[in-house]
Amino acid sequence: SSFAIEAMKDFRESFKTYPEEVSILEGSKDLRQKSRELRSYYDGPFGEEFLNRNGRKSEKINDIFNQLTPQAIRFQHSFIWDNPNPLGSKHLLNRPNQADQSDYARAHETYHPYFSSFLERFGYYDIFLVDPETGEIVYSVFKELDYATSLLDGPYADTNFGEAFRAVQGIRNSERVK
C-alpha cells in the first residue's frame, strides 16, 4: 500500500538521524549508561522469561548483546528498556517518551497504530520494515531483541530471518514481487 511505502521511507530516513536527535534531546545520558541499562533488561526480564519457558538460560544472550551496534543500543533502550509496558507488551507503546521529539518518534506515533491494528486483524507474528540496503530492522510492531539490528551482519544475520532477507535482497529487479 502507499501508506506502507511512505512509512518505510519515513522510518528509513529517521532511523539514520535518530542517534543525533536523541543525543541532543537527552544530553547527559551517554551510550555507556544506556548500554548498562539495556543489559539489565537482557539479563533481567528477558533472561528470566527465557529461563521460565526453556528451563535454561540462553547461551547466546551474551553474543547477541555484544553484537549490538550503538544505533541498536539507542533504539532498544528507548523502545524496549525505557518502555513502561512489560515484556510481551512492548507493542503497546506509541511514542517512546513525551520529551522525544525526534522524527523517528513522530513517525512511530503516526504509523505504529496502523501496523499494530493490521497485525491483530490478520494474526501476524510481527510486522517488520527492513532497510533493503543495510538490512537494519528500522521498525517492528513487537520490538523484540532483533529490533534495530542488521540482518546482514548483526546478531540475527545467521538466522532463518537473515537468510530470508538475503534471499529476497538477491532477487533481480525484473523478478521483484510487486
Predicted features by range, described:
Residues 1-103, 116, 120-125:
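Juxtamembrane extracytoplasmic/periplasmic/luminal helical "stalk" adjacent to the first N-terminal
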